Amino acid sequence: MGGWMSCAPPIYTPHTNSWTESGWDRTSWWRWSAQRWSGWSFKIVRANKALRVMAKTKMPLVLIPPSPNKPYSKLAINQELHLTPHKKTSPATSSSLKPRPGPRGYLNARLSWRCPTLSRKVRVPTIKVPMVRAPSTKPSKTSSSNNPWPLTPRMRG
């Protein structure tokens, strides 16, 4: 079984709530995880296959199955690495009302990972205020022009 075991995956330790591997400092761990997750779409698929195998043999605490018909939790590991936003379970809606899935790809994944609000359109309710016209200054009796400073000499030019 390549992939997971060959490039030394970390071991989940429940008491620290993290993935650790003896002899790894944090920099090498970051290098490993960056390599592991740099190719988003197809590597996650490969990780899912590995998870399916791991769910049958040894099951870490992160991968406790969420329900009997879903034997393993797909996003458990990337959630542990904080690479994917945790999806809130939404009430079942008809598929026609669901938004189309965005383009799969590195950019989309990185954007949604960094700032999850980028994809969501926020509509701010605008308060309609009836327009009140400013009172027009009446032309004064003394000067024929509508000059707000009637005492200053008229500008030439």
Curated annotation (Swiss-Prot):
Top-level taxon: Bacteria
Family, as annotated: To M.pneumoniae MPN_091 and MPN_413.
Region (Disordered): 76-105, 132-157
UniProt-recorded name of the protein: Uncharacterized protein MPN_463
Biased composition regions of type Low complexity, renumbered to the chain: 135-148
